[in-house]
């Protein structure tokens, strides 16, 4: 997490709230920082409260929304997308813009800095010309990008005041210590991993059972697929939501896993049975 751009995002949220702007109802928002220290310096700066008012509450830390754990869309929005076959957009400050990654119904995904994510959320659309079009209207007054964007001096003064090395040292001091639920997990100490036959998350793959040290040459190899444009690794092996109707979903259902506990392909990468059923299923 880049503290400078996150502080900028908080300042934009503060100005937006003070000017009376709100995120439109059809825009779903979430905030998943890469580190817990982010919450502390945003709270210390008095900015998280403004992000919360715009709907950017912290939903977790690390890979959450960007891996597909974004939760459901509003029912009306979902029905409109499916009925009218709409190409709707998500915009994130993560590092993946794959089709369907954020949500199966969201085809287009754009990457942007955190401040721009806030700005686009406020505008409620992706096809906006920030140079000439207003982001929103409050009390009859048009609000433009220039009205919300903080100055470099403002950001510099705030970062110098808030970002102290002690803040990071304190948060990373016990980096390997979890909460009470994590610490309560009972595990056997051993030099090798204790495979569980019942786990649907981590399953011992059979591929190395007959491992041989003998190396052989490969002759006349051929590509499995030759693909056109806009094909991503997610089309080959998805990382997002597991649908109940998919082969991977059926596999989990047969093992008494409920639909709301399917999680994502990304979270079940340690189970080859799930992943092989997800191949080319995007």
Predicted regions and their residues:
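Glycine-rich and small/hydrophobic secondary-structure elements
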Residues: 49-56
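Generic short alpha-helical hydrophobic face used as a protein-protein interaction/packing hotspot
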Residues: 55, 121-122, 256, 279
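Mobile "lid/hinge" segments at catalytic clefts and subdomain interfaces of large enzymes
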Residues: 2-28, 57-175, 179
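Non-catalytic terminal/interface segments that mediate subunit docking, oligomerization
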Residues: 1-42, 46, 181-282
